[in-house]
């Protein structure tokens, strides 16, 4: 027989009272202040900075090929963080529609908190709609960004087909 796990009702006054008293929470272990914030975090931050500086000194990598003012590249690409919107403008036949689609991105991001606001859980596995929308948006943005680096005829298939 399968065991049914009941989800807690966070609007229940009895449960709220128990949580307010401290029931259901762990109060053991090492406190974050001052141990983590004063000792561990600076070590991690300084270690990360030392790693970046050390790698830059040991193996300085070129950011790209040197600029040649007398040769114009065949295709001018924007910075990497603008690849998805550049791909939208490149692929959509009507430029006004492309601008409207780019303007709809912030509007879509503003709607994300309202998609599944009735669900009080924070665990992504208990919020399937919000998790699915987030994963779809992330994969779609990556697909657009990677496609922007290909020629226009191969940008939809990413050169795979």
Swiss-Prot record:
It is found in: Cellular thylakoid membrane. It holds the Pfam family Cytochrom_B_C. The keyword Nucleotide-binding does not apply. Its main location: membrane. Coiled coil: none annotated. GO terms for cellular component: plasma membrane-derived thylakoid membrane. One of its GO terms (molecular function) is electron transporter, transferring electrons within cytochrome b6/f complex of photosystem II activity. It is a multi-pass membrane protein. Keywords: Electron transport, Membrane, Photosynthesis, Thylakoid, Transmembrane, Transmembrane helix, Transport. One of its GO terms (biological process) is photosynthetic electron transport chain. It comes from the Bacteria. The chain crosses the membrane at residues 37-57, 96-116, 132-152. PANTHER family: CYTOCHROME B (PTHR19271:SF16). Component of the cytochrome b6-f complex, which mediates electron transfer between photosystem II (PSII) and photosystem I (PSI), cyclic electron flow around PSI, and state transitions. Belongs to the cytochrome b family. PetD subfamily. The 4 large subunits of the cytochrome b6-f complex are cytochrome b6, subunit IV (17 kDa polypeptide, PetD), cytochrome f and the Rieske protein, while the 4 small subunits are PetG, PetL, PetM and PetN. The complex functions as a dimer. NCBIfam families: cytb6_f_IV (TIGR01156). This is Cytochrome b6-f complex subunit 4. It comes from Cyanothece sp. (strain PCC 7425 / ATCC 29141). The gene is petD.
């Amino acid at each position: 027989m399968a065991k049914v796990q009941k989800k807690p009702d966070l609007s229940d006054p009895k449960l709220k009272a128990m949580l307010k008293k401290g029931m259901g929470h762990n109060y053991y272990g090492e406190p974050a202040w001052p141990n983590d914030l004063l000792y561990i975090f600076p070590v991690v931050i300084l270690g990360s900075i030392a790693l970046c500086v050390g790698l830059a000194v040991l193996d300085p990598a070129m950011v790209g090929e040197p600029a040649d003012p007398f040769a114009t590249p065949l295709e001018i690409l924007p910075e990497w963080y603008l690849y998805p919107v550049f791909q939208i403008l490149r692929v959509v036949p009507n430029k006004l529609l492309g601008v409207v689609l780019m303007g709809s991105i912030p509007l879509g991001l503003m709607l994300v908190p309202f998609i599944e606001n009735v669900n009080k859980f924070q665990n992504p596995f208990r919020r399937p709609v919000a998790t699915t929308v987030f994963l779809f948006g992330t994969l779609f943005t990556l697909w657009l960004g990677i496609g922007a680096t290909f020629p226009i005829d191969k940008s939809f298939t990413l050169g795979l087909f």
